[in-house]
């Protein structure tokens, strides 16, 4: 899978094709993070074939739909449990991110894993994503924002293009 652009969260439901031996096969549901619905269905069948004796050839996708965030305007802390294949083996990992949406946090996770561990998207398997309370956060990078009186410095930007335009009617504004 290529983790291109912002990933989206899909709910994919699939099952084996009904047969005389098994007329009502059980449904299997997964939360899949993928760039589009085609990749989401493909990842579903990849994971299901690892867990159960099912293949896309003798199965059907019952439902594949986009999952919308409940509150996309509220900043939340996300805990992500994942496993990934590195050059030396398979590792389990727990990571924390702050984001507005679940898919945004997972996208951050894919970018972060690529930067810190050189883990490609196809080698990463997201096992669980959960919104976690501020008092349950473990990572210092996330806990530093749990301050009600948090302050950020005002940037003082110096204009690099000083002679474009050379003559202008107002002084440069460097404080924002």
From Swiss-Prot:
Keyword match Ribonucleoprotein: yes
Main location: cytoplasm
GO molecular function: structural constituent of ribosome
Gene Ontology annotations of biological process type: translation
Localization of this protein: Cytoplasm
Superkingdom, natural source: Eukaryota
SUPFAM superfamilies named among the record's database cross-references: RplX-like
Ribonucleoprotein keyword on record: yes
Family: Belongs to the eukaryotic ribosomal protein eL20 family.
PANTHER family: 60S RIBOSOMAL PROTEIN L18A
Function of the protein: Component of the large ribosomal subunit. The ribosome is a large ribonucleoprotein complex responsible for the synthesis of proteins in the cell.
Protein name (Swiss-Prot/TrEMBL): Large ribosomal subunit protein eL20
């Amino acid at each position: 899978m290529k983790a291109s652009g912002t990933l989206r969260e899909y709910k994919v439901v699939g099952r084996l094709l009904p047969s005389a031996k098994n007329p009502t096969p059980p449904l299997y549901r997964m939360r899949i993070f993928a760039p589009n619905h085609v990749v989401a269905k493909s990842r579903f069948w990849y994971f299901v074939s690892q867990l159960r004796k099912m293949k896309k050839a003798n199965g059907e996708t019952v439902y594949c739909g986009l999952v919308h965030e409940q509150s996309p305007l509220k900043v939340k802390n996300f805990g992500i449990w994942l496993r990934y294949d590195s050059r030396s083996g398979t590792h389990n990992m727990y990571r924390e991110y702050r984001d507005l949406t679940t898919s945004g946090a997972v996208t951050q996770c894919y970018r972060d894993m690529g930067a810190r561990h050189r883990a490609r998207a196809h080698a990463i398997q997201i096992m669980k994503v959960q919104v976690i309370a501020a008092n349950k956060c473990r990572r210092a990078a996330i806990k530093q924002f749990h301050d009600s009186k948090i302050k950020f410095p005002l940037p003082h930007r110096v204009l690099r293009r000083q002679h474009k335009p050379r003559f202008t009617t107002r002084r440069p504004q460097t404080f924002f």
